[in-house]
Amino acid sequence: MLNISNLKTEINNTKILNGINLSVKPGEVHAIMGPNGSGKSTLASVLAGKEEHEVISGNIQFLNEEIVGLSPEEISHLGIFLSFQYPVEIPGVSLMNFMKACLDQRHEKLNKPAMPASDFLKKMRETCKSLNIDSDWLSRGINDGFSGGEKKRNEIFQMLLLNPKLAILDETDSGLDIDALKI
């Protein structure tokens, strides 16, 4: 599914990753651990196509397609999801509208018809229920005024709705509240 070979990256002429090799097969779970500053978040960002990281050499293949040089949008359309270490707030954009736009965009890219509104609402409610989230949450701005744990729960919510082929969870435990630990 994912093959990384001899990946070397830098930011502003500072080497960050120096020869990373990793192979992930479908259904496998990998935990990448290391001290602060060892490049874990950099690896996640590179896999998601964030442009501030320059790939000096090496390859990243996802489902037999080279993804180095693809935009974050192109990578997400391939089915890679990144849960951020520090999720951003987007006041004024409701979670419901955001997720509808995401799913519509994905369906369009896959040449599939848009999900009917009734199916979308049903899926949103089911996902809320599975995470013990009040459906009022759907009208809130994305991460607007959310606690650290609520932000993480929101990202899990988004991941479940998008059903990616590969999920990269960066620092999933940072900022968690006690309620989030029950998920």
What are these language model-derived features?
Residues 43, 155-156, 176:
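Hydrophobic anchor residue at the start of the ABC signature
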Residues 14-17, 74, 182:
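Short coil-to-beta microelement around the adenine-binding A-loop and adjacent beta1/P-loop entry
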Residues 88-165:
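ABC-family P-loop ATPase nucleotide-binding domains
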Residues 168-172, 179:
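Walker B catalytic motif
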Residues 2-4, 17:
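Conserved structural motif at the start of ABC-family nucleotide-binding domains
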Residues 33-35:
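The feature captures the beta-strand-to-loop junction immediately N-terminal to the Walker
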Residues 59-75, 143:
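ABC ATPase NBD Q-loop/coupling interface
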